[in-house]
A protein has these predicted regions:
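Phosphate/pyrophosphate-binding loop motifs in nucleotide- or prenyl diphosphate-using proteins
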Residues: 1
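An extended, acidic, His-containing surface patch that forms the Zn2+-binding/catalytic region
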Residues: 4-115
């Protein structure tokens, strides 16, 4: 690797942990249920996005349990998650409370109709 450190500086990098990447397929009923719940709560369809993070257990859930994981967020980029000025707006907090039960309802409906 190309070093950015001056020649007088020695840099040692020690990896501590890691995890495999995970992407939830958008043709999955869990994703479809989440999208339907977001649409009902916010009044517009959700836009799928990929965002980074380190939740190593998510890959293991699928590997070991053979089940997809749905990660549903309600924060904004301006919330500055994990920073000294981290915050989370009450509006999105309440929208999350409204959306999660709808997700379970939509998931159950889609799951039952897929079994037929």
């Amino acid at each position: 690797f190309l070093s950015l450190a001056p020649k007088s500086v020695t840099v040692k990098v020690t990896p501590h942990h890691g995890g495999f990447p995970y992407v939830t397929p958008i043709d999955n009923i869990g994703y479809q249920a989440a999208n339907a719940a977001y649409t009902e709560t916010f009044g517009v369809p959700a836009i799928p996005q990929r965002s980074g993070g380190s939740i190593p257990i998510v890959y293991l859930f699928e590997k070991e349990l053979k089940s997809k994981t749905i990660l549903m967020g309600f924060g904004l980029n301006s919330d500055s998650i994990h920073s000294p000025n981290e915050h989370f707006g009450v509006f999105n907090y309440l929208k999350g409370i409204e959306t999660i039960p709808l997700f379970y309802q939509k998931y159950t409906q889609l799951f039952k109709s897929a079994k037929k």
